């Protein structure tokens, strides 16, 4: 299982979101970059996903019963997004916009930075199934951008969903960059 941190820039409205989040978290210099930095010491992630791998032993908890990559090389990921529809197989809010969802993603591109997750994979997969369709926390996003808007405890944004799935206390305090830094710190402490 890995943490995938998105460092690319989407086109259209999602790209504007990537840039605004990067402006808030990484500063003006990173705001204007459209290509990922080769220097991974610069944290500039604007989105977080948890990636399930074939060796994780949670095939039975995946939407199609396998952690094997599909024909496009995409692996099952879990996160919360504001601008994607919840898949039809979700137990909660299928077809609705925004929230916790499973999605197959090719994370083996330079748009993603991957870090090992030293956490209980089964607990994360169970959390993912139990929370599919949970609403996206737009208020927390506004709070990151303006510093004054509180989060809604029943809703989660991407890094908050990932941190909560991992069992990290105060998950609402994590943004994509601080979650990536926390995971890298855990990995460094283990080595």
Regions found by a protein language model. Give the residues of each.
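A structural motif
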Residues: 98-101, 106, 116-141
């Amino acid at each position: 299982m890995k943490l995938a941190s998105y460092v690319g820039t989407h086109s259209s409205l999602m790209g504007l979101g990537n840039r605004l989040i990067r402006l808030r978290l990484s500063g003006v210099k990173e705001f204007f970059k459209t290509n990922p930095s080769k220097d991974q010491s610069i944290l500039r992630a604007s989105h977080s996903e948890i990636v399930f791998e074939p060796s994780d032993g949670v095939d039975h908890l995946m939407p199609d019963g396998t952690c094997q990559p599909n024909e496009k090389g995409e692996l099952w990921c879990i996160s919360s997004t504001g601008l994607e529809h919840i898949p039809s197989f979700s137990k909660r809010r299928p077809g609705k916009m925004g929230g916790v969802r499973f999605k197959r993603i090719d994370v083996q591109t330079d748009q993603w930075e991957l870090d090992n997750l030293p956490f209980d994979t089964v607990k994360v997969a169970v959390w993912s199934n139990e929370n599919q369709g949970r609403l996206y926390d737009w208020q927390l996003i506004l709070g990151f951008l303006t510093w004054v808007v509180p989060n809604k405890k029943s809703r989660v944004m991407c890094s908050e969903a990932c941190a909560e799935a991992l069992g990290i206390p105060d998950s609402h305090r994590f943004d994509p960059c601080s979650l990536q830094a926390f995971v890298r710190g855990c990995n460094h402490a283990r080595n």
